[in-house]
């Protein structure tokens, strides 16, 4: 199984609490989400436990930006959330609704 996942998805927002900036993320669903779920299951079987909150460590490339973060499972098992921090959004000039090409390396 390849540890690299490539996909495109829109930048979305979620309001966590009134008075705070929204959280920005990309939803990883469909075939890409299933590939990641298979990887997470194999790691859990190998190690005998899950990481905190069921997260998966990844290295991300969006445009010219590259960083490490974690993916988090969506409720109901329907894919994963990839959070995008403000410095990345500013560097890549991303706004809500933009279609983003993402490359993930599962760590």
Model features per residue range: what roles?
Residues 68-105:
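Short, compact, well-ordered microdomains
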Residues 1-78, 103:
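Long, compositionally biased stretches
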